[in-house]
Amino acid sequence: TENIIIDHCSFSWSMEENVTMYDNKYTTMQWCILSEPLYVSKHDKGARGYGAQWGGEHSTFHHNLFAHCVGRTPLVNGARDKSASGHDAFVDTEIINNVHFNWGNKGALYGGQLHSIVEGAYSRTNLINNYYKPGPATNTFQDRWFADCSHDASSATGLGEWYIDGNMFETNEYKNDKNKGDHSKVNANNWIYADENNSKKAVNLRAGIDKINEIKLTAPSAN
């Protein structure tokens, strides 16, 4: 599936993710609401309640609202297809200007792995200018982060690349996390607490400000 825009839609009450996308190309989701997935329904894995699984080659996810999801806001699929002729091998993902409210886990977003065996495959994610506001269901863990770039990376075939900048946590919302509710440092520099020293972590290969033009979408965007 190619050349798709999903605009001004609402998605709720799913048993797993409210929206799941993969094997797609040139896709934009904009100005949508993804909220209230069912936490305990009839899923054979038990409690779920996720926002979205976002995949495909050359995709943009902007100006959307995630509300009242346990996690996966979104799960970034990355380059996941392990067949030699597989799709989703050359992945550029933009996640920009979204609002994340009242997620349940300590990490609102994760993924971006590189699992494809296609020669030259890559997974590049731009996470820019998103706003994170904890709510009543947000667990008050010691740590809280924008993105778990290392998720499942120990089984990956290579490292994903991330450009992360301009994302903002609501400050002073909760006083008992690692930063005592003061997120001014990480708001000023989203990489300040990043672990870049573990070879199993996808964040080990990060795309700096000098590479932003290289990893932006070069294919025609749908928005």
Regions inferred by a protein language model and the residue ranges of each:
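Right-handed parallel beta-helix
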Residues: E2-W13, K25-D44, Y50-V76, R80-N105, ...
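Extracellular beta-rich repeat passengers
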Residues: L75, A89-N223
